[in-house]
Amino acid sequence: QTCALPILTDLYPFPDHPFQVRDDEEMRETIQSVKEYGVIVPAIVRPREEGGYEIVAGHRRKYACEQAGLDTMPVLIRNLDRDAATIIMVDSNLQRENILPSERAKAYKMKLEAIKRQGARNDLTSPKISAKLRSDDEIGQQMGVSGDTVRNYISLTNLVPELMQMVDEKKIALSPAYQIAALKPEEQQMLVTTIDYEQATPSLSQAQRMKKFSQAGRLNEDSMLAIMSEEKKPEKFSLTFDGDRIRKYFPKSYTPLQMENTIIKLLEAWQRKRQRSQER
């Protein structure tokens, strides 16, 4: 590998890069860091046949450099084939905290396909190879999740864009989304219309019934509407906050667990204060 300092206009995004570059609080901190100290960790790039370099790891750093008013960025130039570059690109981004389900799904799929192609090439050149893990189980081990989790996420790439957006926005939970992903595209579009009509998204049990109806060839507008009109069982209460809104009230060193514990303590103190005022 070679170190270089190319101009930003010579750096091109990775084809079908699954991760968004979001202008959030974390990015604003990165931009400020780049302004003060420059890019500390060089990006990884590979040469393009058309000229310039393809970014393998460093899309957010390039954006930060652009916003900081820099013209160049330090990089490590590596001669990588497409599959090796894909694996590095995915691994370098999956370490981030805030990743959308759509990003994780596409990233897992890209890495799985790259590993399978590498395995196929090895099978052609090696007459005897010891038994290997399934590629999705291998990815799961590397990421600290099960192979089933990897397979479930990859199934989300079968969702139509409207439903995938609902999953990203947490309007549809992951468990029902895995079931919905098994529906035919036209059935998913039918579900989009039904969700709009009912102003409700399917629960896990409803999604499971839709999947069974689809497999039996019985899922149509009437059966879908009947399933969606069923009264849902009470689900476990959950509450989520936008990280950027909460983080500004805590020291930068605080972990999410420390933030949660602090919020609980403040709520307990608030509850005691209310109880005392009601007793007066």
Residue spans for each PLM region:
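Short, charged/polar connector segments at secondary-structure boundaries
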Residues: 1-78, 84-98
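Short acidic DE-rich linear segments
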Residues: 272-280
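Amphipathic alpha-helical extensions and coiled-coil-like segments
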Residues: 137-138, 143, 147-272
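Structural motif corresponding to the C-terminal cap of alpha-helices
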Residues: 38, 43, 115-119, 161
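Amphipathic, charge-rich alpha-helical segments that serve as recognition/docking helices
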Residues: 63-158, 168, 182
